[in-house]
Amino acid sequence: MTKVRTRFAPSPTGYMHVGNLRTALYTYLIAKHDGGDFILRIEDTDQERFVEGALDIIYHTLEITGLKHDEGPDIGGPVGPYIQSQRTDIYLEYAKELIDKGKAYYCFCTKERMDSLKNKDDEEKEFYKYDKHCLKLSKEEINEKLASNIPYVIRQNNPESGFTTFHDEIYGDISVDNSELDDMILIKSDGYPTYNFANVVDDHLMGITHVVRGSEYLSSAPKYNRLYDAFGWEVPIYIHCPPIMKDAHQKLSKRNGDASFQDLIEKGYLKEAVLNYIALLGWNPGNEKEIFDLDELVELFNYKNINKSPAIFDNVKLKWMNGEYMKKLPLEEFNKMALPYYKKVISKNLDFLKISELLKIRVEILSEIPDMLDFFNELPEYSTEIYIHKKMKTNLENSLFTLEKILPKFKELSPWTLENIEKCCMDLISELQVKNGIVLWPVRIALSGKKSTPGGAFEIADIIGKDESLKRIEYGIKKLKLESGDN
């Protein structure tokens, strides 16, 4: 049985976007599921789109996500070079082989002629297609133009009748009328190959058995097949993945400023959660389970379970999944990751590990942390209206009564520990013979100035310390007295 060999072939044009990362992940999983090789190849034939630093982003993303390649530009391998701009002589050699076979030809048409063809097709409302003008040139005319250094491209010579059929693992057999196939350019006038031609040549020479790409490339597949046939090469297994949508009508796109992998990490998502979520954008394991580490994905992944229908990128679902990963983190690890976010809003020397105990089960993404914690550093200005809670049966009057009762008890409390704070509050509840909320709601409001907080009255009082707790409760009493007109 032939060893499975897949390739991830990104262009160094900027950040690693979600669609690119999904292609990398599926390509990796297909190879590793069958004990095969995962190859990294850099497609930089469009030099105008090259972005400085983009190559480092590709390497870094693959490294931190655990998608370790077996061959590539940085580690070498038996079928290099693995950067297309270093393989231009190879492409030209194979393009000339196609010319010799009558499957490709030189095209010397000027930009002006090409523009007039496009304009004519636009006027007649037909799709643009090259008219094979240069196919009619004699050998002598071609040699004369080459000797005169007239700029040229090399075009594929596609038939104008009949059908080309190709098989895709997701979409099945697809037939295309050959009259719809343009004679696509194989070698550009700058000597660089087009994306399409370089792909076919490299996939063959590198022994690629499975090709994963987006469904937008389905329309190019017949032209790829005709190239494979022209060379007499075996066609790889095609796996065209459905698009990732922003919503029901709009594709997720870097052109629209949608999040890249790097953006998500900077927003506080965990790389493991992002990778897990991306795996499910178009694929499912056939059961209800949704949380998988990379090893589990390798074991379970079957490309035949990829869907045809577009996948919606659901930020709510991603946040939920990230929260599940947060909960599973060891406390020390979560604390280390959260510390930079704590320090954005907390300048005091508090016990951050205690804060992490509260947050780890409540936070979904790390970037939410500052807004959840600012009250630990400084009591925000707040309205006494938040002391009123229908379910807790609290109002301004009984809230003031509670705070005035708890203040002297807190003053006498020693040592100031979580257990003692809890006992002190629960003793007051028993003494007053009221429900917990009558005491705990106003105490928590006075300590935090917020309706919603990570942790309750006991934990907040413990973390901010005795002096700060007393100061805040005294301030709460003062506010409530002012509200009632009792000075």
From Swiss-Prot:
Keyword Ubl conjugation (UniProt): no
UniProt motif 'HIGH' region: location: 10-20
Signal peptide positions on this chain: none
Cellular localization per UniProt: Cytoplasm
PROSITE patterns assigned to the protein according to its UniProt record, in alphabetical order: AA_TRNA_LIGASE_I (PS00178)
SS bonds (residue pairs): none
Annotated positions binding ATP: K254
Keywords: Aminoacyl-tRNA synthetase, ATP-binding, Cytoplasm, Ligase, Nucleotide-binding, Protein biosynthesis
Any one Gene Ontology molecular-function term assigned to this protein's record: ATP binding
E.C. designation(s): 6.1.1.17
GO cellular component: cytosol
NCBIfam families hit by this protein: gltX_bact
Oligomer status and interactors: Monomer.
The protein, known as: Glutamate--tRNA ligase
Gene behind the chain: gltX
